[in-house]
Each structure stands twice: as C-alpha cells, then as structure tokens.
Amino acid sequence: MPPSSGQLLGDEEREPTSTPAIPEEGVYKVKYSNRRTNIVRLLPNGFQERKLRRLADLSAKLFNEVNYERRQQFFHEGKVDIKGTYKKYYEKYKEKLRTNAQAVLNKNNEAWSSFFSLLNLKKEGKLPQHIKHVSPPGYCKDRKTKKRKLILIVRQDRYKVDAENNKLILKDFNMEIEFVGRLRWYGKQGRLEIIFDETRNAWYAHIPVEVGVEETGKKSKHVVKGERKSIQIAKPKGNKVASIDLGINVIASVVVSDGTWLLYKGIRTKEDYFYFHKRIAEVQSLADRTRNIGEYEAYLELLREERRLFKKLKRRLLHLYRNLASHLIKTLHELGVSTIYLGNPFNIVQEKGDNFMTDKWPYRKLMHAIELKAQEYGMKVYEVDEYNTTKYCAYHDVKVKRNPRGVVICPKGHKLHSDLNGALNILKKAVGVVVNEVKKPLSFIVDHNRVAPIKGV
C-alpha cells in the first residue's frame, strides 16, 4: 500500500536528550525515553546469507539515491522536496523491497528533519555546545572504500521476533533466520535494522522497542517478548544531590551534598586508548604504503583491520563506562541521591592536546551510560556546561593556579584537588550550593570485569 505522504516517523531508539532548565546558566535537564534496543546476532544459512546481502545492498542503494537527489536540491535551491522525492523513490523500489521501502525513506526523512532542526538552532544561536558543524545527511557507505554499507531496514509491522524458538521472521522476504543473544527488553517493536559487520563477518539485528508498551488504543500484535517490561527498577531513597566532574586521569569525580567524595580512576581507559591507537597508526601507515604501490587487495584488507581495531577499542571503552556507571549509580542510590548534576566537558575537547583529551566520543558515551543507568533508579539528571569550573576556586570565586600534580592553589591561601574543585563548581553553578566539609575520598579503579576500591587512599 503506497504511503499517503512523505511523513516523518520515529521508530528508532532515542538517547536521553537535554532541554534548557536554566539556559543562561548552562544547565539542561535530561529528558528520558522509554525506547531501548535489543541487539542479537543472526545465523543465516547460505541461501539466507546471499539473499540478505542482495536486500541489504538494495536498501542502502535506495537510501543513497534519495539522499543524493535531496542533497542536490538543497545545494542548488536551498530547500528539499521531501514529499516529491519520497513518492518517486517509493514507486521505484516498492516491487523489490515491498512496503519496507517506506521504512528506508522514513529513515532518510528523519535525517533531513534533524538536519533542518539543527540549522534552525544554529540560526538562533542555540546549537548544543558539543556540535560544531551542521552538515546535510551523509551516505550509507564506507568513507575510505566508498562501498555501500550493507543494511536492511524493515518496517515495524513487517517482521516478527519468535522469542521461544530464537527466530527472526521477515514476512515480505519469506525468511525465518535463527539468532543468538539476549532479548533484554519487552515492548512494542519499532523499525528493524539488520546490519552486516564486516570486521566480524556477522549479521546483527537491531530491534528497537517501546519498553513496557503493548497497546496504542488497541493491543499491538507486534510485541517483542523480552525479559524486562520496565526501565526503572528502583526509586530514590532520599533527596540528596550530587555533582559529577568528568576527566581523563580521573574519569569521574563525584561530590554528594552530604560531603561524600568519590573518585574513579581512568588507568584502564587510557591504557586501552593509547594501546589501540598505536596499533591503528601502524596499520594506517602500512595501508598507505600498500596503496601507493598499487596493492589494492592488501590495502582493502588493512582497512578492514583498521576498522576492526577501532570497533574493538570502542567496545572496550563502552564496557568500562558501563561498569563505572553501574557502580556509581548504585552507590549514589544507597547514599540517598535523587538528583545528579553531570558536567559536560565541552571545554576540554576544544583545547589542544593529545587525541584522548580532544576526542568528544568518549565523553558523550560516558555521559550517556550514566544517564541511562540513572533512569533505572528514578534519578533526575541535569547536564551542566563545565566552562571555567576548573579555573576558579569553588569557595572564593578567584582564579586558581594548577600544578602538575592535580592540585589547584587558591590565592586566598588554601589548596584543593583539581577534580574536587571541578565537581564543587558544577554543584555551585547548578544550584548555588557549596559543600563546606568534604570527607576523605573513596577511590576506585574501573576495570573490565569489576570496579575495585583502592586501598589506603
């Protein structure tokens, strides 16, 4: 059935978003979503594998074609005919992709809608601090090899997840594909994306759900029967507040309004980051040499190795961040915290330094992990711009001098741990409160299999 219009539909998982609470103070309340994504690995047989490749390539081709025409319209006319291009490419691809062509076009619609929203924010001077450039939607292809990425997009009502038999049923393509993995979330399913991971030579299904939702006026037939029907698992035990300063050597410095001070050391994150970037640099150098001498097959293989190392680094960092977030939020829950003021270190990533200091990705992912875990415990989270929070004394509002050992010296005659000063300033900026008596820090090291206390600190 053809679409009635080029409408903008939203079936994807949404990360927490920030809306101004006190705009002039740089404090933004995080808005939670009830959307989560189950990710499982598919185990297609030989016939299914070949069919998936054809369909995924066709799906990506549709995305790129409509995106190319819309980009040309934008660059030449300054506007985009969403409805006209939607109808044109739906008619072109509906025979092979069926109604799933709508899902591909809707995904591109959403990308353009997001782009125009950011353009408007930029014109109004309200662009989020971590966004420096606004560009039209890009293509579904690898930047270096220029090959299309394999991604099959399926409309939310054109597939079924058989949780009992571990099978993913694609109605329009007559396929029942076995899968392995945990279906953590229970709820109404959204738009499915099946993605081929070239670095692992494996297919993964990304199944978004509205957690706990089974009805929208009437009971939906399209429900993923996962383990959890609710995101929130507990309520706050008290009304205390906490502030979090994110950093490099100390990943998180946390101050609670009762004077509790928590420190999470970043030894493992830096080890992983620099180890993998060294290996990646070696592979990049070798890839450049093979390209220069015309060894194209070897060059492509080295590009795959480079991507594999990047993805492995990201997986390891995400695992560390989730371990930290889980331990931190559980600790704050036991301490009776109900509100968190989370520093947004946009100023750090703008300063010159090594890649670890200037890379925005780790900070955004760490913030995301903390916010998602806080949602499970019913805590409110506000993001606070960290601008100048480490340069001024939290107690006297005067500029401090920082020595190499991580201590700031106030002209008024006292010293503070720089990460403590940052956390105190975040709390002060957010609610106008300064914790006068801070307890001895509880220090932890974040590892891949646990978060362990550091004795004697």
Swiss-Prot record:
It comes from the Viruses. Pfam families: Cas12f1-like_TNB, OrfB_IS605. NCBIfam families: guided_TnpB. InterPro entries: Cas12f1-like_TNB (IPR010095), RNA-guided_DNA_endo/Transpos (IPR051399), Transposase (IPR001959). In the N-terminal section; belongs to the transposase 2 family. In the C-terminal section; belongs to the transposase 35 family. Residues 1-22 are annotated as: Disordered. This is TnpB-like protein ORF457. One of its GO terms (molecular function) is DNA binding. Keywords: DNA recombination, DNA-binding, Transposition. GO terms for biological process: DNA recombination; transposition. The keyword DNA-binding applies. The lineage of its organism: Viruses, Viruses incertae sedis, Bicaudaviridae, Bicaudavirus. It comes from Acidianus two-tailed virus (ATV).
